[in-house]
Amino acid sequence: MKSLDADKKASKTSEAAPAAAEKVAEKVDFSNVKIEPIFEEMVDFDTFAKSDFRAVKILACEAVPKSKKLLKFTLDDGERKDRVILSGIHEYYEPEELVGKTAIAIVSLPPRNMMGIDSEGMLISAVHEEDGHEGLNLLMVNDRIPAGAKLY
């Protein structure tokens, strides 16, 4: 006679198999993708160490009036909830699809005025060319990473 616990374990094992199958990574064909060459000029470690990369939560995102490219992000950087960063990625993303996501930003850049708005950092994106068209992916991480988490 099988114990009730044995039935539960067997059930969990059979349920885990389909779940594991769903997690198989989708294979992407990168044969038509071109990337920029890596910089040959080296950056010394002290200069790199001044770059402060942080996880940021996207609290709000909106198109910048009179700009076809710029999106205005209001971000939680773990210290204050009003860091504003502008990014020229509107061609690739609609504002509403980014709210609530966790992105990566460099927060140690001096403010830069763009379209009358001070941008207080830079969001990190990956850029490539595919079949003659530029592609861009905003670097987003697991939403379980808290705002302000430092990247090393």
Residue ranges and their predicted role:
Residues M1-Y152:
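Phosphate-backbone binding interfaces of nucleic-acid-interacting proteins
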